[in-house]
UniProtKB/Swiss-Prot annotation:
Signal peptide: 1-21
Gene3D superfamilies for the chain: 2.60.120.200
Residues carrying covalently attached carbohydrate according to the record: N53, N82, N100, N129, N205
Name the UniProt record assigns to this protein: Lectin
PANTHER family to which the protein is assigned, alphabetical: CONCANAVALIN A-LIKE LECTIN FAMILY PROTEIN, LECTIN
GO molecular-function term, one example from the UniProt record: carbohydrate binding
Source species of the chain: Phaseolus lunatus (Lima bean)
């Protein structure tokens, strides 16, 4: 078996807006299943969030897929159509076993429809049902793709927005901490991602114009999705999220904070 490597990522997402008054905040330094919607192979173990399966030897399982969402719906835009301001931060651990793979491993921070179910595994990342533009997905995600697939990936290992990507040579930064800053400015509709390695000072950037209010429902679920092709494991160590709106509407009928494990 080839050697394994470890990457710890701290992800900071900031969606910036000029108007903000109603606020929502949560902070998980450890994870409790009672506060989460766990789907597919995702589990909470010893305070960590494990998105994909591992074998009894601690190696990644083939074709594993999992999603973990905060159990309360999040209002992403108000009744006037304004998008929200949402700063959030997360820390991750990825462990890779380098070998031949049949599916693309990747992990994502995602905004998905409330009560949505996991979609197809592998290259569709548990978020989509088809490879073409899936207009029914109503999903926005930032993908960290640690496997280069010649058929699908135009660049090397990459940070992707779906509508743009930047090469990310994961193997050059084995075991290093990385900080990710994601910002959305609703006045300019500009979404930007910056991946920074403090030890080396190396930074990668990708950006795109996205009208979140035209892509997402008023209410969304916030969380993570990951897939594995016998290549890597995906652990979330901590997470915090805040949302600010000019006004806060009533939560959709029938939605609550109860845990759902699927």
């Amino acid at each position: 078996m080839a050697s394994s490597v470890l990457l710890v990522l701290s992800l900071f997402l900031v969606l910036l807006l000029t108007q903000a008054s109603a606020e929502l905040f949560f902070n998980f330094q450890t994870f409790n299943a009672a506060n989460l919607i766990l789907q597919g192979n995702a589990v909470s173990s010893k305070g960590h969030l494990l998105l994909t399966n591992v074998t009894h030897n601690g190696e990644p399982s083939v074709a594993s897929s999992g999603r973990a969402l905060y159990s309360a719906p999040i209002q992403i835009r108000d009744s006037t159509g304004n998008a929200s301001s949402t700063p959030t931060s997360h820390s991750y651990t990825l462990q890779q076993i380098f070998q031949n793979v049949t599916d693309d491993p990747a992990w994502l921070f995602a905004l998905v429809p409330v009560d949505s179910q996991p979609k197809k595994k592998g290259r569709l990342l548990g978020l989509f049902n088809k490879s073409e533009n899936d207009i029914n997905a109503l999903t926005v995600a930032v993908e960290f793709d640690t496997c280069h697939n010649l058929d699908w990936d135009k660049n090397s290992i990459a940070v992707n927005l779906g509508i743009g990507s930047v090469p990310w040579n994961f193997r050059d930064y084995d075991g290093q901490n990385a900080d990710v800053l994601i910002t959305y400015d609703s006045s300019t509709k500009f979404l930007a991602v910056s991946l920074f390695y403090p030890i080396t000072g190396k930074r990668n950037n990708v950006s795109a114009n996205v009208e979140l209010e035209k892509v997402l429902d008023d209410w969304v679920s916030v969380g993570f999705s990951a897939t594995s092709g016998a290549y890597e494991t995906h652990d979330v160590l901590s997470s915090s999220f805040a949302s600010k709106l000019s006004s806060l509407d009533e939560c959709p009928t029938g939605e609550n904070l109860l845990n759902k494990i699927l």
